[in-house]
Amino acid sequence: MANIKEIARLANVSVSTVSRVLNHHPYVSEEKRKLVHQVMKELDYTPNRTAIDLIRGKTHTVGVILPYSDHPCFDKIVNGITKAAFQHEYATTLLPTNYNPDIEIKYLELLRTKKIDGLIITSRANHWDSILAYQEYGPVIACEDTGDIDVPCAFNDRKTAYAESFRYLKSRGHENIAFTCVREADRSPSTADKAAAYKAVCGRLEDRHMLSGCNDMNDGELAAEHFYMSGRVPTAIYANSDEVAAGIHLFAKKNNWDVEIIGEGNTSISRVLGFPSLDLNLEQLGIAAFSLFLQDEPADIKIQHKFKKKA
C-alpha cells in the first residue's frame, strides 16, 4: 500500500511537502501541489483521515447530545445544527442518551479523547457539576438557559413562552387546566419552567394537573384517558408537542369530550387539526448553538418564540 514516503519519491519532493499538501497548508507552490495530487491519483492513495486529524488537532466533527433520535422537538434543533455545520464544512455526530447519565458521560469522554472538536447538548441527563470539567477539552454548548453557570447557550425564555400559552387558555375562560411533559420537574429544566409558569398564571399546581412520560401520539391518547378518567376532568390541556396534542385530540373526538388543546412545535399537525401551538423556533436555536461552537468568546443567544393561535 502506498505511503507518503513513496509519494514524495515519485513526485520528487520532500515528505514534509507531501504532508503540507495533505493538510492543505498554504505554503506549497501550486506546481508541487498538483504534482503530489497527480501521484496520489495514480497510486489510488487515500489519506488516513484519523492520522491527519491527530496531526491537525481537529476532526471537523461536532457531537450533538440528545435524548432521542426520533423526537420532533430535537429533530428541529438537529436540523438547525447540521445546516449550519454543513456551511462550515463540519460533520455532525448524533449521540442519543435516552436520558442515561452514564451514556452521556461516555459521550463527554469523546471530547476529552479528541474524537470530536466540541459538543452541543440539546438536553442533558447529568447535573452541570459532572459536565463542566469537560470544557477543558473543547467547547460545550447548551440549548437551555444556563444562567450563572459558565456555559455558552442558545435558549428560549421558556417561562415567558409557557406563561403565554397558559394565559391564552385562561383568557378563554378555563380554570381547570392540565399539561403534559416528558420528564418530571425535578429532572427536567423545561418541565420546571412549565410548572413555574403554570403557578404564575393558574395558581396552585397539584399532581392531577400534570402528567409526565409523554413523547408521541400514543402517549397523548393515554394522557387524555388519564385526565378524562380523573375525578375533576380538565377543560383544557397544554400538550408538550403537537404529536401528543394529536393523541389527546383523537381521544377527545372518540369520547365526545369538549376539551381545548394547545400543542407545541407549530407543525403541520396543529395546522391540519386546527389547535393553537407554541413555536419555540428550535431550528433557529440549533443554528445559534452551532454559531456559539465556532466563537472564541463565550456568549448567550436568546431565541424568540411565537404563539400561533387558532385560525
Swiss-Prot record:
Signal peptide: none annotated. InterPro entries: HTH_LacI, Lambda_DNA-bd_dom_sf, Peripla_BP/Lac1_sug-bd_dom, Peripla_BP_I. Residues 1-56 form the HTH lacI-type domain. The keyword RNA-binding does not apply. GO terms for molecular function: DNA-binding transcription factor activity; transcription cis-regulatory region binding. Residues 4-23 bind DNA. One of its GO terms (biological process) is regulation of DNA-templated transcription. Keywords: DNA-binding, Repressor, Transcription, Transcription regulation. Seems to be complexed to phosphorylated HPr. Transcriptional regulator involved in catabolite repression of several operons. PANTHER family: CATABOLITE CONTROL PROTEIN B, LACI-RELATED TRANSCRIPTIONAL REPRESSOR. This is Catabolite control protein B.
